[in-house]
């Protein structure tokens, strides 16, 4: 069995390629480039609908065909993304470097998996992505391809072609009479899905520059948000939100409702400088309005239902899971093990929370659960009917025994 790198190093033996296609400038240029570079091979465009919005998908099929693709598959992955990737991940408590809710990272495995499925369906011998050679996504996609379809060749044009700028791409398309609505003045690099939108590039490359209001698209500025708070009631079953304000909703639709209501109150903005997998630091501005509310709701119920040791273990799992997801290692035995081990704890996360939305903040102000370990009788500072404070004396003596022995030893 060969374990050689499947990335294409020469331009032979490629007859049909499935391209992860967005309709943007990069992937519009990739289609003719593939045909020219790989001996007029057939190009099948694939677009994953992960909730990036109707505007991003409008006219996509026609655009792909006009650019030279023989077919374009647009696959609806929205519900699957939220139910099978986002919820299992946040159930582990995964949050990268303490702030990033992994919006881009969680979407890459499902996109890669669907791309492989299309490749199998059409009998392709290669897959192609438009990720740059400086970013994390090239590793995420190709790591998934290696795990799911090691026989498929992988083409990464940004690591092959000589074009280095948007102007180069525009000139390339113009020379081939391929129409595009893109311009050379694009300010930000954005990536959107149902969970979040990321913003990079432009003025954001200097961390001394405050993001302008034009950066943000999913949320209003907190200072411009309503002067009155809004309260949202959420019901949870086995770690998933099933109702918003009493209305039963699917995982994806619940997220969409929360995106709208939380975004209107400026909730979910972060501006971070993160450590990329490839070794450099990068600045990113992220908006995750609904996800921020969901994450807070789950953590609030966990506070009620998980004992101390379980919470400590879940925090350790969350830290490791965050790195696995960020680093593109979803389809690995370790990731599968962490997800499976976390499920019994997630199954305890049942109950109801009320979240207060106000000026950029999402605060859980009410919470209850049928699985709650909290007992008002035990926690009260009143009479000792159920908790005899004298019992603490023996516990403290045993708990501090090692410290006592160490101190006595040092006095000898």
From Swiss-Prot:
Keyword Iron-sulfur: no
SUPFAM superfamilies: Adenine nucleotide alpha hydrolases-like (SSF52402), Argininosuccinate synthetase, C-terminal domain (SSF69864)
UniProt-annotated binding residues for ATP: 20-28, 48, 130
Listed InterPro entries: Arginosuc_syn_C, Arginosuc_syn_N, Arginosuc_synth, Arginosuc_synth_CS, Arginosuc_synth_type_1_subfam, AS_cat/multimer_dom_body, Rossmann-like_a/b/a_fold
Record pathway: Amino-acid biosynthesis; L-arginine biosynthesis; L-arginine from L-ornithine and carbamoyl phosphate: step 2/3
Binding site for L-citrulline: 100, 105, 136, 140, 189, 198, 274, 286
HAMAP family in the record: Arg_succ_synth_type1 (MF_00005)
Protein name per Swiss-Prot or TrEMBL: Argininosuccinate synthase
Organism of origin: Shewanella pealeana (strain ATCC 700345 / ANG-SQ1)
